[in-house]
A protein has these predicted regions:
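Non-heme Fe(II) oxygenase catalytic core, chiefly the N-lobe of the double-stranded beta-helix
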Residues: 1-101, 106-135
Length: 135
């Protein structure tokens, strides 16, 4: 966002904080464990601790809202940010082959699984590394 968005868009969200819920859109899949879903508050724009570069830190699946502004305004801003992030200019495509491994840094990248491998199967293991608090 820092390089592609105008000054006005950056200024509008630079100090905003989001509510981030682990189960987010997937919460209804298992109501029994709802009380244990972790919540966190993160900045909309975070600074990568190694590179120092700025990155959007919102996600359709887990970001519920921008705090301290009306919900309709939050929804509109988030919709704009999600559409911005989904621009093909910001995407990397991975072509799976036998024994492929994909690894990315969630501090500056997101993934979106495409169900494009029918009739084949694809399996994966999620590895989460305990990291820093986004700033």
């Amino acid at each position: 966002m820092e390089r592609r968005q105008g000054h006005e868009a950056r200024e509008a969200v630079k100090n905003c904080v989001i509510d981030h819920v682990y189960r987010g859109l997937f919460a209804n899949f298992s109501e029994a464990d709802r009380p244990t879903y972790p919540r966190a508050q993160h900045p909309v724009i975070r600074t990568h601790p190694v590179t120092g570069k700025k990155a959007l830190y919102v996600n359709r699946g887990f970001t519920t809202r921008i705090l301290d502004i009306p919900i309709d305004e939050s929804d509109g801003i988030l919709r704009y940010l999600y559409e911005h992030m989904e621009n093909p200019l910001f995407q990397c495509r991975f072509r799976w082959q036998p024994n492929s491994v994909a690894f990315w840094d969630n501090r500056c990248a997101q993934h979106r699984a495409l169900w494009d491998y029918w009739p084949h199967t694809r399996s994966g293991t999620r590895v989460t590394i305990k990291g820093d608090k986004p700033v």
